[in-house]
């Protein structure tokens, strides 16, 4: 009887350990799901709503220079700080007329006026305006779908502008950030350049969970020839 009791005691300890481990695993899964749900919602809010979009033509930066890799602009009622990955990029646009097409979230601060931050999204102003249709090929779970199109109106366009316009289409047609069904959890937007280079964006890159970290993917301000690329999208 002692022999059986001793092993019964050990069995209880093992059982308790299994229960604890199961609880920890379950807690981690719940936390991960909650994290993903929040971030999917944030991505949808960021790309879906036009209130987050900064558009401006033929404007110059203000003389107020805070850092060498940032330029400040006044866009309607918004005080906008545009950050770049390298300071030489900001120097290219300093004191020149530029067009802006970028996403921005309002800075959280106790300060007068509305302050916003963006990352890249700038091209030199060009008087040559011409509507160009760019084809967007979509593979939905490896099945090719009818192509979509976005339009741009400049000879040079930023990769950010293209990505924003493509995501808006994907949200509208495929509901890619839907939290109820979560039909999709992986996806890429690939700008396939005729030069042979690809620019790839992860549709489900969350950064640190805040808007600015999600937008830093655009800080290199990559620009491309509007007539020399198409877009490939894969979602699953």
Swiss-Prot record:
InterPro entries: Enterotoxin (IPR008992), Staph/Strept_toxin_CS (IPR006126), Staph_tox_OB (IPR006173), SuperAg_toxin_C (IPR016091), Superantigen_bac (IPR013307), Toxin_b-grasp_Staph/Strep (IPR006123). One of its GO terms (cellular component) is extracellular region. It holds the Pfam family Stap_Strp_tox_C. Its main location: secreted. It is found in: Secreted. It comes from the Bacteria. Mitogenic for human peripheral blood lymphocytes. Binds to major histocompatibility complex class II beta chain. SUPFAM superfamilies: Bacterial enterotoxins (SSF50203), Superantigen toxins, C-terminal domain (SSF54334). Keywords: Secreted, Signal, Toxin, Virulence. Residues 1-32 form the signal peptide. The keyword Ribosomal protein does not apply. This is Exotoxin type H. The gene is speH. Gene3D superfamilies: 2.40.50.110, 3.10.20.120. Transmembrane segments: none annotated. GO terms for molecular function: toxin activity. Coiled coil: none annotated. Disulfide bonds: none annotated. The keyword Secreted applies. Belongs to the staphylococcal/streptococcal toxin family.
């Amino acid at each position: 009887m002692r022999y059986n009791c001793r092993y019964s005691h050990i069995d209880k300890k093992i059982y308790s350990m299994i229960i604890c481990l199961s609880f920890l695993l379950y807690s981690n899964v719940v936390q991960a799901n909650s994290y993903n749900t929040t971030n999917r919602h944030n991505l949808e809010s960021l790309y879906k709503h036009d209130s987050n979009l900064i558009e401006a033509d033929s404007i110059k930066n203000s003389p107020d220079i805070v850092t060498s890799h940032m330029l400040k602009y006044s866009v309607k009622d918004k005080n906008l700080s545009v950050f770049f990955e390298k300071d030489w990029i900001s120097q290219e646009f300093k004191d020149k007329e530029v067009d802006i097409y970028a996403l921005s979230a309002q800075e959280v601060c106790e300060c007068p006026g509305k302050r916003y931050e963006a990352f890249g999204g700038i091209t030199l102003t060009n008087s040559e305006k011409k509507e160009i249709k760019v084809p967007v090929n979509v593979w939905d779970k490896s099945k090719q779908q009818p192509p979509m199109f976005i339009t741009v109106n400049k000879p040079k366009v930023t990769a950010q502008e293209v990505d924003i316009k493509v995501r808006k289409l994907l949200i509208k047609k495929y509901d890619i950030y839907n939290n109820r069904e979560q039909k999709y959890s992986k996806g890429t937007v690939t700008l396939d350049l005729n030069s042979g280079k690809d620019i790839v964006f992860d549709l489900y890159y969350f950064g640190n969970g805040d808007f600015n970290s999600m937008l830093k993917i655009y800080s290199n301000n990559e620009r491309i020839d509007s007539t020399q690329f198409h877009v490939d999208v894969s979602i699953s």
